[in-house]
Amino acid sequence: MGQCYYNETIGFFYNNSGKELSSHWRPKDVVVVALGLTVSVLVLLTNLLVIAAIASNRRFHQPIYYLLGNLAAADLFAGVAYLFLMFHTGPRTARLSLEGWFLRQGLLDTSLTASVATLLAIAVERHRSVMAVQLHSRLPRGRVVMLIVGVWVAALGLGLLPAHSWHCLCALDRCSRMAPLLSRSYLAVWALSSLLVFLLMVAVYTRIFFYVRRRVQRMAEHVSCHPRYRETTLSLVKTVVIILGAFVVCWTPGQVVLLLDGLGCESCNVLAVEKYFLLLAEANSLVNAAVYSCRDAEMRRTFRRLLCCACLRQSTRESVHYTSSAQGGASTRIMLPENGHPLMDSTL
């Protein structure tokens, strides 16, 4: 093992990798932070709504929805991690300690790994449900919990490894350009792992598609339901294309630049696009909520109920304030909405 540089500054490693460390806010930095903060806030709000919907509706207390809830939790964590990054980027990067830098990177790696791993778990669970011809899988809750725990153990493992061993503090020639404190091999392994997850998802959803198509074709041979057969097939194709297309659009650019940097491509200008591709990967945490949750009719109804309930409470508070003011300090306040009808708790 060569000399270790545990007492050096962040600037030392950035200079070693050839990555510019800005001393002031450039227009590019401002644009990235503005977009990043916007995406992070949307990710937080959207996934909080998904978690609230799953927790409040007993119909969602099924294994597949537990996995959707875990996906929302992972994406919520990703929003927090990216928000932390936005407050510690640009000129503020130079002021980070080595521990602070590894914390910033570890939060991102852990949350994004958990999100990707949960996508694969959902695909496997859907495959199991379809093959068992069940609307909702009867997978025991204990096994679902073990699956979720496994996802987070793997995510924490990949997220914590760089800070403890998989770094380049003792081998400067192995440092990556995109993440100057990380080993290039770590980036390559992370990119290849994400690519493997995508290929497994393609295989699983392709098998689901052909299985369902064969079953519907058999039904169509015995029952006059050709329009329904066509509708079911097109709906399934649409779902598969949306799921895989969203993953490709959001993750492929980032995976490519990570792999190129991990393989040591000196002629590849990965630093010019890394921030935007990372933002695109973070946007996947917003897309997941739309693809996996908002396409569910019952989930949409629960969203409307939660949002309307919040609006109704706000309207009630305003009505109470107006009524109490009009009565000039009377001790009895009448709680009526603007239409004059009694309020009904929409959660019942």
UniProtKB/Swiss-Prot annotation:
Principal place of residence: other
Entry keyword Transmembrane: yes
Molecular-function GO term, any one: G protein-coupled receptor activity
Membrane topology (Extracellular): 1-30, 88-100, 165-185, 261-276
Effect of L348A: Abolishes interaction with MAGI3
Transmembrane intervals: 31-51, 67-87, 101-123, 144-164, 186-206, 240-260, 277-294
Residue positions with a glycan: N7, N15
Impact noted for substituting T347A: Does not affect interaction with MAGI3
Coiled coil: none
A Pfam family the protein falls into: 7tm_1
Keywords for this protein: Cell membrane, G-protein coupled receptor, Glycoprotein, Lipoprotein, Membrane, Palmitate, Receptor, Transducer, Transmembrane, Transmembrane helix
Gene Ontology CC terms, in alphabetical order: cell surface; cytoplasm; glutamatergic synapse; plasma membrane; presynaptic active zone membrane
Signal peptide: none
Record motif PDZ-binding, residues: 345-348
InterPro entries xref list: GPCR_Rhodpsn, GPCR_Rhodpsn_7TM, LPA_rcpt, LPA_rcpt_EDG4
Subcellular location: Cell surface; Cell membrane
GO biological process terms, semicolon-separated: adenylate cyclase-activating G protein-coupled receptor signaling pathway; G protein-coupled receptor signaling pathway; positive regulation of cytosolic calcium ion concentration; positive regulation of MAPK cascade; positive regulation of Rho protein signal transduction; regulation of metabolic process
Membrane-related topology note: Multi-pass membrane protein
Tissue expression profile of the protein: Expressed most abundantly in testes and peripheral blood leukocytes with less expression in pancreas, spleen, thymus and prostate. Little or no expression in heart, brain, placenta, lung, liver, skeletal muscle, kidney, ovary, small intestine, or colon.
Lipidation (S-palmitoyl cysteine): C308
Additional observations: PubMed:9525886 cDNA clone has a guanine nucleotide deletion that causes a frameshift near its C-terminal coding region. This likely reflects a somatic mutation in the ovary tumor cells from which the cDNA was isolated and may have altered the function of the encoded receptor, and contributed to transformation of the original ovary cells that formed a tumor.
Family recorded in the similarity comment: Belongs to the G-protein coupled receptor 1 family.
Function: Receptor for lysophosphatidic acid (LPA), a mediator of diverse cellular activities. Seems to be coupled to the G(i)/G(o), G(12)/G(13), and G(q) families of heteromeric G proteins. Plays a key role in phospholipase C-beta (PLC-beta) signaling pathway. Stimulates phospholipase C (PLC) activity in a manner that is independent of RALA activation.
Protein name: Lysophosphatidic acid receptor 2
Native source species: Homo sapiens
Gene encoding the protein: LPAR2
